[in-house]
């Protein structure tokens, strides 16, 4: 059965047809609408899926935010440009005329990455470091989503009680410091206004402040991983996202994690499916690979 998989992120929308063997075809991308109003998102999704829907039998959505009974909510509304209570499943069922499933993008990515691991791995955590910081938890071979869809939102654990205010309302969240948005917000002087991609470029050129911002992000993520290990006793952690997959970043996270006491050490690896993990995980779930 062919699935039309959609990934809704803070900066881009992606869609592709995925068959039962997880082969991807006809991948398309559009920028996430700048206005992020309900009408703008609805029109962008329509333009994205219209060329693909005739060949699909169902729709699977991986989206940033919290999914509750088909509604798209946000723990940090800034990641969705203030968009709240968007009827995601209903909208796609209307556009595509197909049965539709929706799940958080990091939870979906965790499910895809779990299936790429050896069979003896039953407990793993996926962490995405991108516009925000998110995650997904697989425990004893089951994906944890939680009653309200909140499970795995690791970016909203505490990093610094004196840190910046997070979009979720807490002070000092991991996401407020370590995410691409958090790094950019902390940039000063000649780096003011730079996005995370530019900060990595400048860090590679030897810019001291840029190197500090990247290093600070990696250290915060490493400390969060130590917390995650203590809570879940996971066998491995997989890192994805545009920041998480940036050159040299995982190595820094690993080095900082090794500075933590030995009980908190855990194997780290880069996401095998990279930027397609959300699409593939959502397709797996829609094809009956249940929670």
From Swiss-Prot:
Family: Belongs to the ROK (NagC/XylR) family. NanK subfamily.
UniProt keyword terms in alphabetical order: ATP-binding, Carbohydrate metabolism, Kinase, Metal-binding, Nucleotide-binding, Transferase, Zinc
Pfam name, any one: ROK
Protein name: N-acetylmannosamine kinase
Residues annotated to bind ATP: 5-12, 132-139
Single GO BP term: N-acetylneuraminate catabolic process
Its job: Catalyzes the phosphorylation of N-acetylmannosamine (ManNAc) to ManNAc-6-P.
HAMAP family reported in the protein's UniProt record: ManNAc_kinase (MF_01234)
Organism expressing this protein natively: Salmonella schwarzengrund (strain CVM19633)
